[in-house]
Every structure is written in C-alpha cells, then in structure tokens.
Amino acid sequence: MSKPKAKKIFLGVDYGQRRIGLAYAASPLFISLPIGFIEAGKTLEATAQSLAKIILEREVSCVVLGNPIPMQIGQKSSLQEEILKISSLIQEFCHVDVVLWDERLSSAQAERMLKCDCGLSRKQRKGKTDSVAATLILTNFLESSPSIRF
C-alpha cells in the first residue's frame, strides 16, 4: 500500500515596502486565492517574522516570492536586494522552499483588473491590489510549473 502524498501548500507573495500582498493555493486543485495583505515591518527581519508566522500557521511548503526584474537587462533595483534578503530570512526562520518568480507588471495588471471589474475607488483598491498581484504571481508560477502538482 502506497503512502499518501503530502499536501502541497503554496503562498504567493507580492513584496512591497509598505504592504505585502498574499495569495494561497493548495493541492489537489492549486487554485490561487487572494488572502489579503500585511503591513511591512519597520525592519526586514520584522517583515520576515510576520511572513514566517503566516507560513507556519498555514503549513506552507513553498513560498513564491515576486521578483521585480527590471525591463532593461543587467539592471538591479534596491527592491530586488530587499527581496533577496527577505527570501534568505524566510528560509532561515521557516526552512521552506522559496522560489523567486518574475513579477514584472503584476501590480499594474492587478490595478487594471480592479479598476475595470470592481468599480472601486483608488483608496478602496489599495490593499486589494497587492493581494491580487500576489494571486497573479502564484497563478503564473503554478501554470508554468505543472510538474509541481505531482
């Protein structure tokens, strides 16, 4: 008799210096759902600890962290440096896999979606944009990586 497969749980993260959008997907369906956002902490360590709490509470097995790759090849942004540090801290605190995923234009796409579909004001869209962007990041990752489902 074969052992049942462990449930795979993913957390999508749209990292920002003010707010961090979050999305969730779990086996067997792997449908990405927005789960809100958290405010960034005063330090990277504080932010990573807030994320670690969510990761441990939800028993996440893999974090998909949006990586804002600049449009021009060879450039690196200060935000990318923070994301690399956050990635290392998450791995240190939680011992989970962290995948850096290209998030170019995900926030802009999320903003357009909310503006067109919901009729919300800019103020009302603020936090929702971040969690929708995290959902887009996680969905793109899951759709381009079908082997992770098995």
Curated annotation (Swiss-Prot):
It comes from the Bacteria. Could be a nuclease involved in processing of the 5'-end of pre-16S rRNA. The keyword Cytoplasm applies. Its main location: cytoplasm. It comes from Chlamydia felis (strain Fe/C-56) (Chlamydophila felis). It is found in: Cytoplasm. GO terms for molecular function: nuclease activity. Keywords: Cytoplasm, Hydrolase, Nuclease, Ribosome biogenesis. This is Putative pre-16S rRNA nuclease. SUPFAM superfamilies: Ribonuclease H-like. Belongs to the YqgF nuclease family. One of its GO terms (cellular component) is cytosol. CDD domains: YqgF (cd16964). The keyword Oxidoreductase does not apply. InterPro entries: RNaseH-like_sf, YqgF, YqgF/RNaseH-like_dom, YqgF/RNaseH-like_dom_sf.
